């Protein structure tokens, strides 16, 4: 174990609350084209193209810039949703969970579920803008919203497209997804990392340990979150008629069968796998170098 790892094991270090959001922004900048293709696939009518066909179509019709449609909204989402859920989870771990129980899922799961719920609610408005901006170019010209950026999107939705009701469209499935994502992504990362270190003798300070644990966490998170993710995309991309989530679900099951809830699993994992690896890698690097922390804490 490295000197830094030994020191960390010996005392309860309180890292800055914004590490999760900063790491999320970094991961988003890299994986945004994959997320864009995933959203387009989830909203597209049948028959659906493959992930790579969708990326090829976006590149051919919209150019390289098109691959980053809605990037400002995606960054805003990380500043809200990811910052809140990671920050709240770490805060609860530091102040609520007994030190000897930091790898006990009976303690971790409730903390992660609460953190995911408030993160999903806090980031809902950014999620609505994000999904609409990503899918805008795929719509007919007359139906496009043409938001200039995330702030313009928030303003236009609030001013002209239904106000807060529209900005919080889909908040219930988004909170459910936040709960599922945080529980399946953050908790499983902690559990897998602990298992690799204590059972398989991985070095807790090494990048390969972090990347292995995060890859496994991404696999679990994609599978657990797929149904809520598909529902969230369809609700938030709606035209504003505010149909109940259960009606949208029933219509989709009737027309497409129950398997629609896992539609886009592969593109979701193709995006969420690398995203999860990058976000935890970035968090571990921020912690390793104590970025933004007072000198006496370094």
Curated annotation (Swiss-Prot):
- Membrane topology category: Multi-pass membrane protein
> Which Gene3D superfamilies does the annotation name?
Mitochondrial carrier domain
Q: Return the InterPro entries for the record.
A: Mito_Metabolite_Transporter, Mitochondrial_sb/sol_carrier, Mt_carrier_dom_sf
Q: Which residues cross the membrane?
A: 17-37, 58-76, 105-126, 170-189, 211-231, 265-283
Does the keyword Transmembrane helix feature in the UniProt annotation?
A: yes
Annotated Solcar repeats reside at 11-95, 103-195, 205-289
Query: Main role?
Result: Mitochondrial dicarboxylic transporter catalyzing the exchange of dicarboxylic acids like malate and succinate for inorganic phosphate. Required for growth on ethanol and acetate.
Q: What is known of its domains?
A: The C-terminal Solcar repeat is required for association with the TIM22 translocation complex during import.
Q: How does it assemble?
A: Homodimer. Binds to the TIM22 translocation complex during import.
This protein is called Mitochondrial dicarboxylate transporter
What species is given as this protein's source? Saccharomyces cerevisiae (strain ATCC 204508 / S288c)
Q: Lineage of this protein's species? A: Eukaryota, Fungi, Dikarya, Ascomycota, Saccharomycotina
Q: Which gene encodes it?
A: DIC1
């Amino acid at each position: 174990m490295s000197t830094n790892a030994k020191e960390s094991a010996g005392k309860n270090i309180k890292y800055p609350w914004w590490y999760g959001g900063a790491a999320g922004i970094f991961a988003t900048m890299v994986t945004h084209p994959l997320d864009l293709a995933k959203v387009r696939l989830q909203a597209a009518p049948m028959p659906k193209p493959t992930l790579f066909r969708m990326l090829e179509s976006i590149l051919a019709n919209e150019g390289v810039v098109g691959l980053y449609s809605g990037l400002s909204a995606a960054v805003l989402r990380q500043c809200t949703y990811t910052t809140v859920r990671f920050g709240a989870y770490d805060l609860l771990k530091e102040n609520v969970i007994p030190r000897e129980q930091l790898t006990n899922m009976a303690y971790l799961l409730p903390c992660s579920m609460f953190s995911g719920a408030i993160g999903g609610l806090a980031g809902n408005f950014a999620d609505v803008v994000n999904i609409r901006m990503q899918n805008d170019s795929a719509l007919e010209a007359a139906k496009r919203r043409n938001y200039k950026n995330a702030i313009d999107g928030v303003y236009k939705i609030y001013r002209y497209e239904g106000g807060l009701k529209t900005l919080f469209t889909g908040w219930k499935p988004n909170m459910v997804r936040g709960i599922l994502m945080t529980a399946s992504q953050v908790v499983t990362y902690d559990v897998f990392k602990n298992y690799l270190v204590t059972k398989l003798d991985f070095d807790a300070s090494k990048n390969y340990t972090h990347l292995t644990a995060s890859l496994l966490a991404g696999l679990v998170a994609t599978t657990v979150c797929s149904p809520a993710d598909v529902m969230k995309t369809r609700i938030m991309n709606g035209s504003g008629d505010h149909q109940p989530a259960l009606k949208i679900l029933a219509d989709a099951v009737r027309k497409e069968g129950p398997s629609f809830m896992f539609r886009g699993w592969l593109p979701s994992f193709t995006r969420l796998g690398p995203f999860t690896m990058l976000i935890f890698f970035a968090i571990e690097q921020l912690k390793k170098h104590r970025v933004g922390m007072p000198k006496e804490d370094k």
